[in-house]
Amino acid sequence: EIPLRLVGSEMCIRDRLTYVQNGILAAILLNSGAADFVVTGCGTGEGAMLALNSFPGVLCGHVVDPSDAYMFMQINDGNAIALPFAKGFGWGAELNLTYIFEKLFEGEPGGGYPKERVVPEQRNKKILDGVRAVTLKQDLVEVLKELDQDLVKGAVAGEKFEELFFANCKDEKIAEYVKTLR
C-alpha cells in the first residue's frame, strides 16, 4: 500500500490556472519534494499532460479510465496523471474517478503489466529515464527563470500555496527561487 499525503487540493482554487501553469506548479511541487504525485487535467487531459511533460523531473500519463491508471503506474511508474475533465465525463464520472484512483495506487509501481513483461518494461523505463535525463537536463530553477515571470507567479499565487509548499518543500534551491516570486 502506498502512503498518500494530500498536499493541498486548495492550492489553485482561488484563481483558475491554465494547464501550462498547472505544469509549472506540478514541476515545482514534484522537483522540490513537496509532493510525491500530482493529479491534474483539463478539458481533454492532453494539454495538461503535454505541459507537465515539458518539465524535468515530471513523467505524466494521460488517464481516461481505470485500466489506463493501472497500466501507467505498472508500466511507466510516473509521478503525475492528467485527466480529461470535460471529454467523456458525463454519467458515471464519479464511478470512473473512484475506479481510476483505486487502480492508480494498486500494487507496487513499476511491477509490470502483464506481470510476465516486467523485465522488458523495467528495461524500457530505464531507457526512457536516460533519454529524458539528456533531453530535459536543464535545472528546473533555470527553466523557471527563463519563462515569463508573470506566468510563473500566477502558477504559485494560490491562496494556500505558500503555506503548503514551504511546509513540505525539501529542496532549498527551489524554495529560495519561489520566495523571489512573492
For the regions a language model picked out, list residue spans one by one.
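Single conserved hydrophobic/aromatic residue that forms the stacking wall/gate
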Residues: E1-G8, C12
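C-terminal binding/interaction regions
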Residues: Y70-E176, T180-L181
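Short Gly/Thr/Asp-enriched flexible loops that form oxyanion-binding sites at enzyme active sites
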Residues: G47-C60, V64-D65
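A short, small-residue-rich loop immediately preceding and capping a beta-strand
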Residues: A35-G41, C60
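Gly/Ser/Thr-rich loops at beta-strand to alpha-helix junctions
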Residues: C42-G47, G88-F89
